[in-house]
Structure formats: C-alpha cells, structure tokens
Amino acid sequence: MTEGILFDAAMLTTLALTLKLATVTTVLLLALGTPLAWWLSRGGGLWKEIVATLVSLPIVLPPTVLGFYLLIAMGPNSPLTDLLGFKLSFTFAGLVVGSVIYSLPFVVNPIRNAFVAMGPRPMEVAATLRASPLDAFFTVALPQAAPGLITGAILGFAHTVGEFGVVLMIGGGIPGRTKVLSVTIFDYVETLEWDKAHVLAGGMLAMSFVVILAMMLIERRYGTGARR
Amino acid sequence: MISARFSGRQGDFTLDAAFDVPGQGVTALFGPSGCGKTTVLRCMAGLTRLPGGHLVVNGVTWQEGRQITPPHRRAVGYVFQEASLFTHLSVRENLVYGLRRARGPLRISEAEVTQLLGIDPLLRRPTATLSGGERQRVAIGRALLSQPELLLMDEPLSALDRISRDEILPYLERLHASLQMPVILVSHDLSEVERLADTLVLMEAGRVRAAGPIAAMQADPNLPLIHRPDLAAVIEGVVIALDPAYGLSTLQVPGGRIVVPGNLGPIGARRRLRVPATDVSLGRHAPTDTTILNALPAVILGAEAAEGYQITVRLALGASGEGASLLARVSRKSFDLLGFQPGEQVVARLKAMALSAPAQTGG
C-alpha cells in the first residue's frame, strides 16, 4: 500500500460523490421523515399501519428488488418519466430518490419511536401554555425527540454510504455521476485491484465502527437525561 | 360565573356533567376515582373534546356544542397531576414558556410568582435535581405566569408524598388568598378540599350529584358526605383577639366566637377552621367547671343515624340558629337520654385543642 493509492483521483471522485449523495439524502430524509414520523406517532388506525409497513419494507426487501422496481419506474416509457419529461435512471437525482426510499425506515423509525416515547403530555402542557400546535412542535416535540433525530440522521447517512444493490441497479456505476464507494470496491475486486479495495473497505469499516459508537454514546447521554 | 356542561362518550364511559359555580374562589370537583372529574377538567381546558355541552367562563364562551376553542386560544392555566416540566428547558425557561406566549394585560409578574411560590432558589437548578414538591411548585408557577383567567388543577398533590404535600399546601392556601382568578381543583381527598375549596361539586359515575358552598354541602342530609367517619364542618371567621399569655386566638364566626390555640394573627385576618363532628358534644346548659373553652349556643336543625350506634346532629350556631353550620356526632344513647328535638336550643361544646386553623389563609 503506497501514498499513490490513497490519492488516486478516481477514488477521491468516488468518495466525494458518495459523501454528497449521503448528505443530500440525509437532509431530504430529515425534512420528509420528521413530519411523517410525527404523523405515524399520533394515534392509531389501519391507514397508519399500512403506511408504516410501506416505510419499513426496505428493511426486509432485497435491494435488487427495490432497485429493479425503481429502475422500471425511472426508465423510459414509465408514467413517472412521462410526467417529469426526463429519465431519472442513471442520474445523480435518480440515486438520491432511490437512496431516500431505501434509507427511509432507518430515519423514520427512530424519530417515530422518540415521539411515541415522549407521549402526549408535553404537547398538552404546551397547548395550555398558549403554544400553537406548530409552535409546540418546534419548541417542545423536536427538542424532546432530539436523540431520535440524531440517531435517525446518523443511521440514514451511514446506510446511504453503504448501499450497493439499489445504486447499482438504478445508477449503473458511471464514474463521477453515479459510481459510489460500494460499487467502486466491487469493481476493484472484479479487476483484482486488491490494494485499492483494501483502502476503501477498511475506511468503510472504520467509519461504520465510529458511527455505531457515536450512536451508543448519544443514546447513553440522552437516555439518562430523558428519564429526568 | 362559570357555567359548564359536558356530555358524551369516551370508550365505555359516559359523561353527562353540568354545574354552575361562582366565577371566583376555589371550586373542588370531588368524587371517587373514575367518576369523570379529570375528564371534566380536560374538557374545561379543551384537551378533551366532547361534542355535547357548553362552557362559559365569566362571560367568555369556550365551547358551544361542536364549536370548541382549541386549548392554546383559551386563557387557561393547567396543573397536571405530575409536574410535567419540560426536561429540555431550565427551571426559569419552564416558568416563562407561557409568559412569553401570553396575550392581554399582565396580571401576575415573574417576580410575584417566584416570591409567592418560593421558587427563587430553584431558578438556576436543572429540573432533574428538583424534588417532587419543588417540581409541582414550578409547574404551578408556570401555569400562573401564562396569565390565565381560569386555573385548573388536576390532583396537584396526589403524586406527592406526605412531606411534599405539607410543604406545598401552604403555598396553595396563599394562592387562594391572594389571587383573584377562579380555580377549579380536582381532588379525591376531602381534607384537601376542606382546606382549600369554597365551592364543592360532588361527582358520581359521570354525573354531578350536587354543587354548592362547601359548608352547605357538608351538612346536607341528602348527600353522602354526612355519613363519612371523618365528617367535619368548615367555618370561616375573622381574628378579633389574641392572647399571647395563653397562646390563644379568638375568632368571630357567624353566630359565635371560637377560641383556637396558636397565634392566628394579625387581627382582622380571615381564617378557616375545620371542626370535626366527633369533637363536638351537646348539652342543655353552658358548662361550668370544665376544661372546654368553647361552648356556643346553637339550634338543632336535624339528626341522621350514623354508623356504630351514633347520631349525626346538624346544627346552626347562634341563639336563634342564624349562624354558621356545625356538625356533631354523638352516641345514640346520650342523644335519646337527653331527648333532643329539631328546633331545640342547645349548647355545643368544642374541644379547643382539636381545632386546626390552616396557617396564612386569608389576608
């Protein structure tokens, strides 16, 4: 392993693309997932269970299955493509859409659990203190659910960095556009460039370890705080 | 004037409760657990919505059938059974959460509230380190600072241990004495009600059995209160004399004077006495050669059989029965031996040492 391998231009492009994809996906997931998690956490009903099931599907579905359907939906002659006027398949935007759907449960579920654990009381207290529902959501619900939001963001980011099947199906691995880390590792292995594969795989292993450790620490800190 | 009526179903429970109570002072919603007290209180805050009924508080309509003002648009303060402080905020941030959002004129300031409830030393402490009683005081202060026109309290003391309860009761009595706003208090503890409430709403199985001034409700022979073993009469009076040499205070109550142990001053202060029925005995003549300090003329209004061969005698103080109502529980044998009849003038003897005067009420 030499310095030259670490500064490989193709590798840096891949790394930058992966981080960009994960960042955009995480931001979108927090923006979409938080209201969705709130809605799912308030009250019951069959509809909510059906939506919750759909949200959780990517946990059990093989990524290739999800990628296959997304590829069809984003490909030529699909209703979505007709509606948009352009194809999403094999584009960065397509990857973002796929990643958002693929990582949705990893963001929505921890946030939903945090809202459920909070219970209805804090929002009732806020209402009797003249806070409108929106005001109370931002000044009470979000701060109280902070550990869930942080966990969701970390999981969503890490999961997007690590995805393989979906991005390969809908992105194809075009360098600089849709070729992310996991696909690059696969390519290196296929072409017997073991040294480069080692660098990327080792990097991802280290990152995963740090992510899980960070989550445990956050959980421990806020976990004891929440029982006040 | 507070006019309330709520009817509707919640699961298996049917509520149909209506009452009109004065728009000032403390009104207690009293009844066994599961009778719907808390549901009524939640309806008054708008937290629970029952489509049937109305709520008008001192001229402001908060509910008329299905037209229900949401809780955040009502000038209502709510103290929950558990303090429910916001754990992500400091004590002070909790206190001013409602104050920042309050509309209309400032009725009570942060300084007044912290002084009234003794919160000052707590302001800089994290909410996690407060005791149960301290938390509940902060919760009450937080509700008061939202400048409510109506304060609702759902068993604010029931989650506390005896010591915290004794610590917080004097604060509640001070609130009662110094605040103008009406308070609705949910309670299943009669002694708490007797210390704090002016008006009693008696609830049973989702309905209001009766409502009225507490003294009248205690002495009503048609209500279950009169059969309680801990029956007592609540009498309000004014301090008219102090005797420091003997450690006694004299209160002028409607229809008589009562001597009470302790310095209840200053002169002119209003005080509330709780006189247990078992501490009142009856005779035909003023006693001589006795250690009993209080012997007051009274008129027998009626008598009800009580458990354990006893009789509950309803009385009114004063030679012609014009004064406050008083209750006595005596043995059936002595009652029959003396042949007391309704309308008869008697002398009620009160064990002075048994009188308890909650400190610092009135002003």
Curated annotation (Swiss-Prot), chain A:
It is found in: Cell inner membrane. SUPFAM superfamilies: MetI-like. The keyword Transmembrane applies. Its main location: membrane. Pfam families: BPD_transp_1. CDD domains: TM_PBP2. The chain crosses the membrane at residues 21-41, 54-74, 88-108, 133-153, 154-174, 198-218. It is a multi-pass membrane protein. Coiled coil: none annotated. Part of the binding-protein-dependent transport system for molybdenum; probably responsible for the translocation of the substrate across the membrane. Keywords: Cell inner membrane, Cell membrane, Membrane, Molybdenum, Transmembrane, Transmembrane helix, Transport. Gene3D superfamilies: MetI-like (1.10.3720.10). It comes from the Bacteria. The keyword Transmembrane helix applies. Homodimer. GO terms for cellular component: plasma membrane. One of its GO terms (molecular function) is molybdate ion transmembrane transporter activity. Residues 15-217 form the ABC transmembrane type-1 domain. Belongs to the binding-protein-dependent transport system permease family. CysTW subfamily. This is Molybdenum transport system permease protein ModB.
From Swiss-Prot, chain B:
It holds the Pfam family ABC_tran. GO terms for cellular component: plasma membrane. Its EC number is 7.3.2.5. It is found in: Cell inner membrane. Residues 1-230 form the ABC transporter domain. Signal peptide: none annotated. One of its GO terms (molecular function) is ATP hydrolysis activity. Keywords: ATP-binding, Cell inner membrane, Cell membrane, Membrane, Molybdenum, Nucleotide-binding, Translocase, Transport. Its main location: membrane. Residues 289-359 form the Mop domain. ATP binds at residues 31-38. It is a peripheral membrane protein. The keyword Cell membrane applies. It catalyses: molybdate(out) + ATP + H2O = molybdate(in) + ADP + phosphate + H(+). The complex is composed of two ATP-binding proteins (ModC), two transmembrane proteins (ModB) and a solute-binding protein (ModA). Belongs to the ABC transporter superfamily. Molybdate importer (TC 3.A.1.8) family. Part of the ABC transporter complex ModABC involved in molybdenum import. Responsible for energy coupling to the transport system. This is Molybdenum import ATP-binding protein ModC. It comes from Rhodobacter capsulatus (Rhodopseudomonas capsulata). The gene is modC.
